[in-house]
Amino acid sequence: MTDKKFILDTDIGDDIDDAYALDFALKKNLPLLGVTTVFRWADERARIAKKMAVLYGKKLPVYAGLKGAWDADGHCCQWTADLENEAYAPDNENGIPSDAIDFIVQSAKRYGKNLVLLAIGPLTNIAAAIEKDPSAMSGIGGVIMMGGDYANQYVEWNINCDIPAAKTVFSSDLPVTAFGCEVTSKFVVSEKQQRYMLNMRGSEYKKYLSLLTNLWLKSKLPGWRICLHDVMVVRQASENYCDFAEIDMHLETESAYTYGM
């Protein structure tokens, strides 16, 4: 996949697996064009992603995207005061004349089939890019996403956060490779691995990732284990390690009882 370029579209700042997905991309030196953030506190999410990139030593454009239709009181659960630092501001807050949707569309025009979108949050940004320039978006290499459940009658979180956007993406001409929750929910770390993730030492980057992990875990019930759903998407982009079955996908939006399934 050496010719491929990737954009990571993420709701980093909720579940901790988004942070580890970005961590995996950084450590594997995945050819990321940039990161776009989505859903409710998109600006704060962008600051978290930007801080990770800065502490890692990577020059990586980060764009705050669309917040969606949900209310957004308060802050991301990982929000801390030091994210106010200008060094961690999203690029479209620091004078770069592009927003997340423009960035996706312009990348689609430039890279065509070599561009793959890694969607590990609600599909709001990607649907907006499709609606803005369907011609450019239809020419990209596809979407690898974490979202949905293709074995059970269940409305998965990323789909539920913007069901109309998911409908737009699934109804488009884009090739979609999806990791459903019925698969990703098996990617639970061991107790030993979790202790390491909670107590990383060394670089400021490792300490920050460990801090995010601890802040996230405080919001969970005792004994909660980390599940790295979103890492599977980035690993697939890096290693192409999974086999897939092709299915006909229909997202229900007519029935009140099965809406989003």
Task: Describe the residue ranges of each PLM region.
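Metal-dependent catalytic neighborhoods of phosphoester/phosphodiester hydrolases
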Residues: 43-53, 72-75, 79
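A residue-level signal for conserved active-site and pocket-lining positions in enzyme catalytic cores
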Residues: 62, 169, 234
